[in-house]
Amino acid sequence: MLTSMSVLFTLGLATPFAHAADAVQMGAVLSLTGPNATVGEDVRRAVKLAEDKVNADGGVLGKPFKVIVEDSGGNPTTAINAARKLVSVDKVPVVIGEYSSGISIPMGQYLVKEGVVHINIASTSVKVRDLGSSSFNLIGLEDKGNKFSSQDAWDLGFRNVAILAPNNAYGQGVAHGFRAEFEKLGGKIVNETLYTAGQSTYRRELQQIARTKPDAYIYTAYGQESAVINREALELGLRDKPWYAILLSMSLSDTPANIAQGQLGMEVGSFVGPTGKAYADAFAAKYKEGMKTSYTGYAYDAVLMTAKAIDKAGSTDPAAVQAALKDVGKGYDGVTGKVAFDDGRQRIDPPYAKLKYDGGKVVPR
């Protein structure tokens, strides 16, 4: 009997998910290489954890479930090519990603044009709202984030601040939006500098904002370039004033702990309530460490919601899945809290958190 059971397992016949070719598939385009690779790998882990949970719970449509992950390389052309492969070769009904708004937006436009469902899990530009009828958004966008961060900065006692942000769709939205909200509160922006990404040094920009003698520096930056900015700010003596990061975990994802220590900031909420805690515990158990960024929970929710929508649709037809996802999105208990979409497929009341970097990690304050 033991021998025959061994044969069954060897042949892959002892499980209901014997043939990978029969898997129900969805896609993900993540930044696994390039300046945001740390975030991309963190999110990939969450995607795999979600895939494993779906399969442990019986799969989708009675079949195994698989998320095909492609690398954007942090480049919009590469991301669109990856999405094209997922659509034309793999025939997936849903693609999640990317990370940077400057990449997610053109990729989302392509997916909507092809009639494939796109789920935004990390990009915060308000332009995400305009992607079209098959695009869904799980995360808080800049307008809501700017209100939260400006009020938080005001409550911390900052009155005259300098802003440093990347010169792209995301950075422009943060800089201009924060200015508008902060000035409504009575605050003053003494300098606004938008930097070019990918430079080997940012000393010129840092010296420029330092000359205006702000109460605090408000900034946002992607992982590897942020590490350069934070190191050079320390070397130039700019850490004598508070540094406040919009999206703290992103801005510090590649910065050494001794340099990041003491920074303040805000973030999209990463996990909420008992469901969120169970997810965080499962993540730590599988990967022997906690999440490095706050975006993993959104990817996890997106994968589980997609699996639920495909089951509800009874089909992998993109139009059917889109309709089912709207229904799932009327009230889903996710790890990032309750997910409910408005008529424009945007999340209602997304979570935010007030944070600081202390003892080698991002913690609540």
List each language-model region with its residue ranges.
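Extracytosolic ligand-binding ectodomains
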Residues: 5, 20-365
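Sec/Tat signal peptide C-region and signal peptidase I cleavage site
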Residues: 13-20
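Sec-dependent N-terminal signal peptides
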Residues: 1-8
